Amino acid sequence: MLSARPRLDPIVVTTPPLPRAFVLGNFVQACCWHVARLPQAGETLEAHHLQIEPGGKGLNVAVCLQRLGVAVDTLIGCGDDAAGDALLALLAREGLATTHVHRLTGPSGWGAGLIGADGSNCIAVHPGANRLLTAAHAEAARGAIEAARLVYGQFETALVAVEAAFAIAQARGVPTLLNPSPWQAPPEALRAATHTVIVNEVEAVDLLALPQPLDGTPQGAARAVAAALAGFHAHWPAARRLVVTLGEHGALGAEFDDERWSMWHAPARAINAVDTLGAGDGFSSGYALAVLQGDALPMALAWGNLCGAHVAARTGVIDALPDAQGLAAMIEQAPPAAARQLTFE
């Protein structure tokens, strides 16, 4: 039987300065077509709006954390093209350092997205210069990695750079946060250097080798994830947290401590979802912010949900990423629902 115990700890906005974060970024020039609904295979639909903006999972997280008051260093590869020029202009506007931004020969990354009226989306990405980063680029950023209090990585950049940066972080005792998206099976060395894994409900099926998709309810998802935690721990020996985002159903978080797992569920904020593209990056940013503030897992899930909701309630991604004032306004309107600890009896 699944039961829940409420936690009513308040969520508060702290003021900067906060500790430093190192983000393994990536950059794609994103082109998004807004359509009434997503097309079927072989079908052509007319889009009613075209949106072009800089994007990328790592770039989104770097920008969001910077806006929230975190001191961010980021490793990004971009091409020697107009898109690369646009990236440098964006970083300058956001106040992000470009010490570890590398202009490489060839095109920048490009992405194409279709966004339905209900907020659903499908995305394709050409990595371009993102795949040209190497372990040497991560080594050149060693000082920034070792000075960070959290290192974030994702799979839209070169895997060898992520692996090298996580190894540096682990050797220094810096917690690592991995969003293995787009999903691919991570190498053993990367699994052995990852403290926290964040995936969505689709990626969780691959990550945990589940026999079927999660059933779409927090209770069913929690049972499936809980049953797979022993296998996850064996495959990811350094991992102490696993977070699974459930869209409109919030997020699950599991934590390994004192040789046992505990699990929490944080309900999603009720919003009118306009565009869910980038909501997961918003969640990762809010979660990372909470970790940097020293918050426990239940509060980190609440922060993640709050930032994700801010993005999903707006069109676009970069412009929809919150700052501290934006989050404070949301909290003033309606405090987030308390996370609940789940037990299986």
Predicted regions and their residues:
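Conserved phosphate-binding/catalytic loop of the ribokinase/pfkB sugar-kinase fold
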Residues: 77, 103, 113-155
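Short gly/ser/thr-rich secondary-structure transition/capping motifs
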Residues: 3-6, 131-136, 176-182
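Active-site-proximal loop->helix
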Residues: 82-94, 113-115, 119, 123, ...
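A glycine-rich helix N-cap at a beta->alpha junction
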Residues: 90-105
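Conserved phosphate-binding/catalytic region of the ribokinase-like
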Residues: 2-22, 184-185, 210, 215-345
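Glycine-rich phosphate/adenosyl-contacting loop at the front of the ribokinase-like
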Residues: 1-75, 82-89, 93, 270-274, ...
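Conserved beta-alpha-beta core of the PfkB/ribokinase-like small-molecule kinase fold
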Residues: 150-227, 249-251
